[in-house]
Amino acid sequence: MRVAVDTNLLAYAEGVNSAARRAEAQALLLRLPDRSVVVPAQVLGELFRVLTRKAGVSGESARATIMSWADAFEVEGTTPEVLLRAADLAASHRIDIWDAVILSTAASSGCRLLLSEDLQDGFTWGSVTVVNPFAVQLNPLLDAALKHG
């Protein structure tokens, strides 16, 4: 099962927020099979902004960080088709355009899940279901995607 990740999951894994959330995000990412994870390019851009603006990281360090994530997982870019579908999604569901780009990228990449704390948990668009990876109760789809053992 292919799984897309949103900015907040990577930001938490980088230590933005709290040590407890960092450990939780890192543990979750380690349990996802590497070849199943998709990072929309939009997420890397947002992560750069979060690191430089919110976390006070230098531009050079933030660039190195996003390159590390790009090396670790498959990165999918924003095509004109993805952007147009995102605009339709944003207009029809009143979702922020940049969140819609991430969801549209996940759909075009064949992902079944988008792990996000920002979008509505359980929202399904096409074949992609948004799952809050930090929800108290583990979503069955996320559980199925995780490595066990």
Predicted regions and their residues:
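Short, well-structured N-terminal submotif of metal-dependent ribonuclease cores
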Residues: M1-V39, K54-S61, Q137-D143, K147-G149
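Acidic catalytic patch
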Residues: A41-G45, M67, D71-S92
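Conserved glycosyltransferase catalytic-site signature
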Residues: T7, P80, D99-A100
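Active-site-proximal, substrate-binding regions of enzyme catalytic domains
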Residues: E46-E74
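Acidic, PIN/NYN-like endoribonuclease modules and their adjacent C-terminal/linker elements
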Residues: L103, S108-G149
